[in-house]
């Protein structure tokens, strides 16, 4: 009797298994909710990890990341690019977005801080104690992001203007489209020094070294907001909440960012 019951039970179970689709197929059939995040290039490493952590905590959600210069990203949004979350490396760019009604004002919040540094290739013998030393003949190529569209370029320009060096050093500038391009140029030894954020130098500390911390007249604060044309504003808000959560802030801290 037991053997017969066992065979019947086994047959029924086998039929149920055949009738029930595999878990992987069920997961594939669930609708995936995407959130598209356009973020400043200096956030590349931190936001990549943040996105992965958010996805693990929110099954069925997918974070699509787009990095670039803050001004360039603003232009993309202004031209209708599908973006749900916008994160910049300065207040000025976010102010422009808000003035053009491209973001939801009440969703805007600062989530991180950074500092400006001057870097050189790790094997460089240069020693720079103050910006005036950038006049030295040994420094002929200086990587600096375009101030017209990149926040780190504006911070760098302001520091050089304050020191009375902007015009004199201009012939030595190698303009870049974003901070990671400046970092790349320095790491490959294609320029003598470059202006980047401390977090960028940290991300490539085996290939570049910080030769000077650059004081700025305004804090380097990072704002984030939901875009006005977001196709998934609820998920966008959840992602922003995650960035500001204890877990999100811990990830940012691991990458060298300060608290807002």
What is each residue range found by the language model?
Residues 7-10, 128:
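Low-complexity, intrinsically disordered regions enriched in charged/polar residues
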Residues 1-5:
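N-terminal secretory signal peptides that target proteins for export/translocation
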Residues 27-58, 62-67, 71-81, 88-91, ...:
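Exported/periplasmic ABC-transporter solute-binding proteins
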């Amino acid at each position: 009797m037991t053997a017969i019951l066992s065979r019947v039970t086994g047959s029924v179970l086998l039929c149920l298994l055949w009738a029930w689709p595999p878990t992987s197929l069920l997961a594939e059939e669930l609708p995936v909710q995407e959130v598209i995040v356009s973020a400043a290039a200096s956030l590349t490493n931190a936001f990549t990890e943040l996105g992965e952590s958010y996805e693990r905590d929110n099954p069925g959600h997918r974070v699509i990341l787009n990095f670039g210069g803050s001004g360039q990203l603003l232009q993309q949004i202004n031209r209708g690019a599908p973006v749900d979350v916008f994160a910049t490396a300065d207040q000025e760019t976010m102010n422009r977005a808000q003035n053009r009604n491209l973001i939801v004002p009440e969703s805007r919040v600062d989530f991180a801080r950074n500092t400006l540094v001057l870097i050189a290739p790790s094997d460089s013998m240069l020693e720079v104690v103050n910006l005036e030393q950038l006049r030295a003949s040994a420094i002929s190529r200086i990587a600096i992001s375009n101030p017209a569209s990149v926040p780190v370029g504006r911070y760098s320009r302001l520091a050089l203007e304050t020191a009375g060096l902007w015009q004199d050093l201009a012939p030595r500038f190698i303009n870049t489209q974003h901070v990671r391009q400046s970092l790349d140029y320095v790491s490959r030894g294609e320029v003598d020094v470059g202006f980047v954020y401390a977090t960028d130098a940290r991300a490539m500390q085996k290939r570049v070294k910080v030769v000077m911390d650059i004081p700025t007249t305004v804090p380097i604060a990072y704002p984030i907001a939901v875009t006005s044309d977001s196709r998934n504003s609820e998920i966008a808000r959840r992602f922003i909440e995650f960035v500001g959560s204890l877990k999100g802030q811990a990830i940012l801290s691991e990458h060298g960012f300060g608290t807002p």
